[in-house]
Structures are given as C-alpha cells and as structure tokens.
C-alpha cells in the first residue's frame, strides 16, 4: 500500500463521516423546527440542540477543509 492508497482510504473515511454529520445536522434542524412550532416551546432544549447543531457544523467545516487542499492563488 502506498501513500496514495492510504490517502484515498482516509478521504473515503472522511466522506463517510461527513455524510453522517450532515444527516445528524439536518435531523437536529428538523427537531429544532418542530420544537419551535409547539405552543409552549422548551427554550432550554432548543438552545441545547442549536449548540449541538453548531458544533456539528464546525466539525463538518473542519473535515471539509481536510479534503480540500490549500490553494494559494
């Protein structure tokens, strides 16, 4: 196995992780929307979900940056 194969395997693992994180991010968005539509929304729970959603977004961006090489123009 050479470095390219290891890099490809790593990229595939990152892509899988990204897909999982994106799905969880979307699910949290749906949950927040559903909670906000309730007559008496639980603002503490909504805030917790939003913080988790933001943390997921940060991780998604970090992983996307790993996949994209830095290109200096």
For each feature predicted by the language model, list its residue ranges.
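Short, charge-rich amphipathic alpha-helices with coiled-coil/heptad character
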Residues: 1-8, 29
């Amino acid at each position: 196995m050479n470095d390219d194969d290891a890099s490809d395997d790593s990229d595939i693992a990152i892509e899988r992780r990204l897909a999982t994180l994106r799905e969880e991010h979307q699910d949290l968005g749906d949950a927040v929307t559903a909670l906000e539509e309730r007559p008496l929304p639980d603002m503490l729970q909504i805030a917790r979900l939003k913080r988790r959603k933001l943390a997921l977004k940060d991780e998604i961006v970090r992983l996307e940056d790993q996949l994209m090489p830095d290109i200096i123009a």
